């Protein structure tokens, strides 16, 4: 699940203070874990709030956020509201193949134990069902897209609505691209919700392009790190 980040093309952050201070980008730290969980859940329904969509609100972050900050915290960056609260983040891995192997060893067993079967239906009927979400949590091979050797890194990015349109989405992506380039990674990819047309417009403005195996119902986009 990726990125629900409509953003102004080329815009620099305006003098807006959604928190107690001026928001700024900084590296992730362990104390940000709960903030990342909160942002993930509140942007996981096609860019909207996914609280109450699944039987357990921890499911989305346990598939699309927490494994990343566990495996590669050095490739996680957050927008701090100026008082320590996380308003958005970008997370990624430099080597998807290595991440998949780590996930099988270190993440799948615990995830399976915590979530052995779907919980009580909520009546929300999301397009990405709870059964699919549980399957994603134990099947990291889903990340091995055909172009993984050309685009070995991948990312997820989410911003709370209060922060969108201020240029932080672009700056987060650029920050991660620079960090990946410094590690010798040439290109990065992402998958996204086809229904999130604002996010797609954002990626197009940044220069992302469709990969060969991209499909209308499940877009795959990539970009060079430099």
Region locations from a protein language model:
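Conserved catalytic-core motifs of GNAT/GCN5-like acyltransferases
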Residues: 96-97, 189-191, 204-223
């Amino acid at each position: 699940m990726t990125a629900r980040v409509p953003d102004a093309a080329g815009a620099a952050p305006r003098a807006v203070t959604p928190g107690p201070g001026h928001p700024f980008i900084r590296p992730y730290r362990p104390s940000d874990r709960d903030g990342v969980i909160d942002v993930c859940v509140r942007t996981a329904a096609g860019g909207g709030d996914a609280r109450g969509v699944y039987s357990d609100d921890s499911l989305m972050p346990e598939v699309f956020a927490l494994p990343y900050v566990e495996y590669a915290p050095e490739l996680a960056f957050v927008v701090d509201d100026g008082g320590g609260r996380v308003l958005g983040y970008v997370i990624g891995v430099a080597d998807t193949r290595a991440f998949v192997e780590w996930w099988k060893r270190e993440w799948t067993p615990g995830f399976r134990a915590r979530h052995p079967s779907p919980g009580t239906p909520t009546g929300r009927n999301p397009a990405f069902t709870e059964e699919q979400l549980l399957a994603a949590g134990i099947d990291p091979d889903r990340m091995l897209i055909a172009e993984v050797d050309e685009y070995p890194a991948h990312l997820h990015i989410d911003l709370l609505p209060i922060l969108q349109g201020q240029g932080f989405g672009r700056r987060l992506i650029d920050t991660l691209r620079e960090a990946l380039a410094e590690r010798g990674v040439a290109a990065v990819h992402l998958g996204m919700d086809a229904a999130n047309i604002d996010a797609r417009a954002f990626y197009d403005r940044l220069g992302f392009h469709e990969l060969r195996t991209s499909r209308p119902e499940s877009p795959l986009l990539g970009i060079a790190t430099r």
